[in-house]
Amino acid sequence: MEISWGRAMWRNFLGQSPDWYKLALLVFLIVNPFIFLANPFIAGWLLVAEFIFTLAMALKCYPLLPGGLLAIEAVIIGMTSAAHVREEVAANLEVLLLLMFMVAGIYFMKQLLLFIFTRLLLSIRSKMVLSLAFCVAAAFLSAFLDALTVVAVVISVAVGFYGIYHRVASSRGEENDMLDDSHIDPHYKTVLEQFRGFLRSLMMHAGVGTALGGVMTMVGEPQNLIIAKAAGWHFGDFFLRMSPVTVPVLVCGLLTCMLVEKMRWFGYGETLPEKVRDVLQQFDDQSRKKRTRQDKIKLIVQAVIGVWLVTALALHLAEVGLIGLSVIILATALTGVTDEHAIGKAFTESLPFTALLTVFFSIVAVIIDQHLFAPIIQFVLQASEHAQLTLFYLFNGLLSSISDNVFVGTIYINEAKAAMENGAISLKQFELLTVAINTGTNLPSVATPNGQAAFLFLLTSALAPLIRLSYGRMVWMALPYTIVLTLIGLLCVEFTLAPATEWMTQAGWLATLS
């Protein structure tokens, strides 16, 4: 017997999502207009909380759908306007271009990356050393590349590793569905679970590595560029001014990496199963035997394009997204990828997230229009100069863990600069606050995927369900890093920032804002 019209509509609404999730979203959509009529400020914070809820439930339903419905309603009831959303999207066009083109560009370098990381994985047997290598590599790369790019690289490598073993375990060859474990023998499933734990830990080490490296340079994170521009700092100035905080944090972050692996805390410590190592070794041996001269040329071309990518980003020869587009053009033209459908596959990973980020900008527009952060900013600027550093750091960290880093960093640096121009704070205090704002925006935000775009990208990627990386598990595995990075950063802002900056200024290493 065919189901009723109402039941059919309910099943279609958000598809396979649980009924309780669908009901919760309907409740949000119904109550928001009434709360907005009663108190717009409370309604604004409620909308932010609801959006965070959709991100937390990313594995129940991709956040673009529920988050998009909330954003559309916010515009309709007047919490913000379509024109303001367009302004926010236009202001963040660089980030959208990055997602569309840079992530797709990395897709065409996967052969080289898989080759390099397979050699790395097979040559380093110690899990602690391997984890440290992944963390250091991610930190170094993210100091020059955007963190999203680095995470995209590691995701592509992890999916490659997982796919190789899953095909063998399921005995289904190229037609294998990596999400389907029904054809896998129980013995293989045990090994597969261990392999998933191994990949989860590597992904988290690499993800935190991007935060450790990204905070150090003005090109490491999008908000760093905005902060550096407001302060009038160039690449060297930015690195030196951040170093009293970022260098100790980097050292302690790497020590944390080794400690959690050694002690097997927080879900870390899982080693690469020997059966998987054997499969990867066989795959590597077969790949080398089958590799033709044409294949070798492709690897060489991809390596040259990789050099171009790092050089262009480090020297800022063009916007990040446009450099990514050049990578797509060069990689496809020089490796013979000419079919439209083959090129289109490169965009399947990044475009859903690009759409999600666009929805997020509409939530940012609500935050601005409803002045949700205004009371916090006023409170901080009323404190003493020494307390301001700590408060800016902590409030940046708190807000960055639930909101967009670029937005939080932009709001605070603009407020700090306005305070300096109005005579509320001195130039020296502004320069110290700039460091507190940048480190506060970048370091504590590793606490949740909401705070780090790279973490959110990982959570919503095709890899997350394969290795069973949920929102809660990601927060739990990030916890030791969150504690160490936040506390060491806070201690450095409190005790080493001012004296170290004073010493570097007297030594003539630092230029001041003119």
Curated annotation (Swiss-Prot):
Membrane-spanning residues = 23-43, 63-83, 97-117, 120-140, 144-164, 202-222, 238-258, 303-323, 357-377, 391-411, 447-467, 475-495
- Determine the domain of life of the protein's source: Bacteria
InterPro entries attached here? Na+/H+_antiporter_NhaB (IPR004671)
Q: Mind telling me which Pfam families this protein's record contains?
A: NhaB
| Entry membrane topology | Multi-pass membrane protein
Question: Family per UniProt?
Answer: Belongs to the NhaB Na(+)/H(+) (TC 2.A.34) antiporter family.
Question: Which NCBIfam families would you find in this protein's record?
Answer: NhaB, PRK09547.1
**Protein name (Swiss-Prot/TrEMBL):** Na(+)/H(+) antiporter NhaB
Species: Salmonella gallinarum (strain 287/91 / NCTC 13346)
